[in-house]
Amino acid sequence: MQRSGVKAVLQPCRHPLQSECMLTDTPPPSSTQIQVAVVMRRERVQGAMSRWQPWRWVLADVVPNEAAFGEEPRQLRHGDEEEQWLHPGFLVQLHRDDAEGYYLNATTDAPCWFVMWRLEEQATVAAEPIARPVMVSLSYYDAGRWLDAQETVEQVPAPVEIVQWLSGFVEENHVPEPKRRRRPESFRSLQDRFG
């Protein structure tokens, strides 16, 4: 999906990653894209807040996509205190023009995945509406744009393999903008300062 001037980093994908290995055994991606699945958790609200909202949805994890996940969301766990849902088939692509956003993420103490999600208006796969991830990114700028648009954005730590992959991309593609010295206002004529 592309909008003018903004490249979306998530596309629903019909060709999941062919790797059948677990996250710890997954080699870092060799290209500029990786397919992932998002795990959302519905948990019971405790305390006084539970009078108004008995349940809440939170982002649980982002994992490499596997062919065994299929294409549709599915429930992984159901209990009295929580449910977990797996949402497969998200393609995360790294774009050169967003290298600074990746740089800001990769150089923090805790690089992370950013996931924008929305609650279904009507239930489609369960008895009640579930949280549906919409986009996944590794860019601070993407997360900022989504938050500016009043979307729900959550984050979870990215594994070491993904951080190394992201750092390699940043090293190859990020070019810091040169700092320009601004002339102090006091040295500009009144015409320049006030039009």
Residue map of PLM features:
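Amphipathic alpha-helical interface segments used for dimerization/assembly
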Residues: 162-174
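Terminal targeting/leader modules
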Residues: 2-3, 8-160, 175-195
